[in-house]
Regions:
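Radical SAM enzyme core and accessory elements
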Residues: 1-120, 124, 202, 418-482
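Key residue(s) within conserved catalytic/signature motifs
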Residues: 147-148, 180, 257
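Canonical Radical SAM [4Fe-4S] cluster-binding loop centered on the CxxxCxxC motif
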Residues: 162-197
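Beta-strand scaffold of nucleotide-dependent catalytic cores
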Residues: 170, 282, 351-355, 425-426, ...
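N-terminal [4Fe-4S]-dependent radical SAM core
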Residues: 96-99, 119-167
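A C-terminal junction/extension of Radical SAM enzymes
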Residues: 28-37, 41, 361-438
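Short, glycine-/Ser/Thr-/acidic-enriched flexible segments
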Residues: 228, 405, 441-444
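Conserved non-cysteine loop/helix-boundary elements of the Radical SAM core domain that shape
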Residues: 185-385
């Protein structure tokens, strides 16, 4: 365990995130003057890193060694917090001998900097210099961020920010819960009797949105989860029939259904989606190594993945995404290489490459305690293997985001053929358009003209969502009252 003593609570989140990035295998705890006395008494003797803040700079003590920062000698045009993060990064880099690929950036949207600077008319060289010197981002990652930001800007030119919105519908059921998952999901076998009532509740929530957003342009629709294809064909048909009867789809640029788990996909369900003109689906293997699928509790076999993908092609889908996760338990570079080779053979239209994120609420934490974090192996080489596979397929990177506690401190990257980019994926990351979310555990984000964002969430519990659907609608009414 790494215990960090911070003299002021203002920067607790930033300090924790950056220290955790350097000490990925350790539990990191930050104590401040606001920490409860009993916890302070327990943890203070274990402090291994102490940060003392002052108006003129800061001092960091690591063991017996002190590191000093004189803020007055640095141009703090971007604020004290960023100056502190640079100082902390330099200190930890010196102590550990590590350089992080994304430098001191700890947020989920590292492309945001490049995007904003492009909007200001800055050149690639200026953006690269800023990211390298102000945030210590590697040249490779900085160039990737610039490349993706340019592509995002081009793709979003046709999107109606103020006069439009996107719609998300969450189906929180799965065949089983995967080891690494912390999303709202429930085993379909135990909830089968509630599914019809759940669909009824979603349609009721849908009615409110359809009635109150008639003056807005609907740009994208995304049905995710969970696993939407855990619904029976008749339930899928009822849900999407209601959706298309209530909303004007003539303006919709992308209609995605995350089919996801191969063990939930059937020809009949695919035919329902195709008949309703779903334009993009996902068939997500995560890995093509059967032993790993067994470990992570993903009951679909490699053969089922292949069958589901081929079925989707036979039915007529011409925009199929596949998701992979790097850093899964026990997987090495050779395993990733074999997975990528199989993906290249299948030739999907887009590929989303995730770095495993260790979520506090997932069963993966327990697995790590039993097997050790060293069994999670993600490296720069595995990232390059995946990128090379996408390039071999003729794909370009089009969106990128990061998560807390991500294996190898890398990123999630979406690759696609030109014309097959996932617009909703970009919109959810860039936070430039209102996204209205329906279903249990979903979060609606309202984006105001000045860039301000306000949210309202639906309860996660399926039974409570059904019971309190009127309250969920009231929450949306309050959010959009102005």
């Amino acid at each position: 365990m790494k215990v960090v003593k911070l003299s002021h609570p203002n920067y607790e989140y930033d300090v924790h995130s950056l220290v955790k990035a350097f000490y990925a295998e350790d539990q990191v705890t930050v104590i401040t003057p606001e920490t409860k006395p009993e916890k302070l008494a327990e943890l203070e003797p274990q402090v291994s890193l102490e940060i003392e803040l002052a108006e003129t700079g800061a001092k960091i003590r690591v063991g017996e060694e002190d590191f000093l920062w004189d803020a007055e000698t640095e141009n703090l045009a971007d604020g004290y917090k960023n100056g502190l993060k640079r100082f902390l990064y330099r200190t930890l880099s010196k102590v550990t001998g590590q350089k992080l690929p994304w430098g001191n950036l700890t947020g989920i949207r590292p492309t945001k900097i490049a995007y904003g600077m492009l909007d200001e008319g800055r050149s690639d060289a200026e953006i690269l210099e800023f990211m390298e010197q102000s945030h210590y981002v590697s040249e490779e990652k900085a160039l990737l961020g610039i490349d993706i930001a340019k592509r995002e800007r081009d793709l979003l030119k046709e999107i109606h920010y103020e006069g439009g919105y996107s719609l998300y519908i969450g189906i929180p059921f799965c065949p089983t819960t995967c080891l690494y998952c912390s999303f709202t999901s429930y085993p379909i076998a135990a909830f089968r009797r509630q599914v019809d009532a759940y669909v009824d509740a979603v349609i009721k929530e849908m009615d409110y949105v359809a009635e109150n957003f008639q003056d807005k342009v609907l740009d994208t629709v995304y049905i995710g989860g969970g696993t939407p294809t855990t619904l029976e064909p008749e339930q899928l048909d009822r849900l999407i029939t209601a959706l298309k009867s209530k909303f004007d789809f003539s303006t919709v640029k992308e209609f995605t259904v995350e089919a996801g788990r191969a063990d939930s996909i059937t020809r009949e369900k695919l035919e329902v989606l195709y008949r309703h003109q779903v334009s993009r689906i996902s068939v997500n293997p995560q890995t093509m190594k059967q032993e790993t699928l067994d470990i992570i509790g993903r009951k679909a076999s490699v053969e089922q993945v292949l069958t589901a993908y081929r079925l989707a092609r036979e039915v007529g889908f011409d925009n199929i995404n596949m998701d992979l996760i790097l850093g899964l338990p026990g997987e090495l570079e050779a395993d990733v290489q074999r997975t990528i080779e199989k993906i290249v053979e299948l030739a999907p239209d887009s590929l989303t490459v995730h770095s495993l994120a260790i979520k506090r609420a997932s069963r993966l934490n327990q697995w790590i305690q039993e097997n050790g974090v060293s069994m999670l192996h993600n490296t720069d080489e595995t990232m390059k293997i995946a990128a090379a596979g996408a390039e071999k397929l003729g794909m370009k990177p089009y969106y990128l985001y990061r998560q807390k506690n991500m294996s190898g401190n890398f990123e999630n990257t979406g690759y696609a053929h030109p014309g097959k980019y996932g617009l909703y994926n970009i919109l959810i990351m860039e936070e430039k358009q209102t996204i209205v979310a329906l279903g249990a555990g979903s979060i609606t984000k309202r984006v105001f003209p000045d860039g301000r964002i306000e949210r309202c969430d639906n309860v996660k519990d399926v039974g409570l969502y059904i019971e309190k659907i009127d309250e969920m609608i009231e929450r949306k009414k309050e959010l959009f009252a102005e």
